[in-house]
């Protein structure tokens, strides 16, 4: 269950962050409507991913995904835009990922 859940979180992050990045590129970097359209499709696909999480509670899944989004966004910036996170960015992302672990995988 943990592996499936973690893989779904990674897929969700790629779709959401990637989709938002594509829209950003299309609008802010003037790359055009093709980029925007691809971003909108990716963002729409992201909306379906949470439904496949093994946990049945929408609020829990989306709350935990927020932590993945924080860390994933920083990583995306490093890979795609040459962003260099500082120690506070990294510490904050680590705290968020610890929260993901507690919310999703703590024994109940």
From Swiss-Prot:
Q: Mind listing the UniProt keywords for this protein, alphabetically?
A: Cell membrane, Membrane, Transmembrane, Transmembrane helix
Q: What is this protein called?
A: UPF0060 membrane protein Mvan_3406
Family indicated by similarity: Belongs to the UPF0060 family.
Which organism encodes this protein? Answer: Mycolicibacterium vanbaalenii (strain DSM 7251 / JCM 13017 / BCRC 16820 / KCTC 9966 / NRRL B-24157 / PYR-1)
Signal sequence, start to end: none
Report the main location listed first in the record.
Answer: membrane
Specify the protein's topology with respect to the membrane.
Answer: Multi-pass membrane protein
The listed locations are: Cell membrane
The domain of life for this entry's organism is Bacteria
**What does the organism's lineage look like at the top?**
Bacteria, Bacillati, Actinomycetota, Actinomycetes, Mycobacteriales
Pfam family of this protein, just one? UPF0060
Q: Name one GO cellular component term.
A: plasma membrane
Give the transmembrane ranges.
7-27, 32-52, 61-81, 87-107
Q: Does the keyword Cell membrane apply?
A: yes
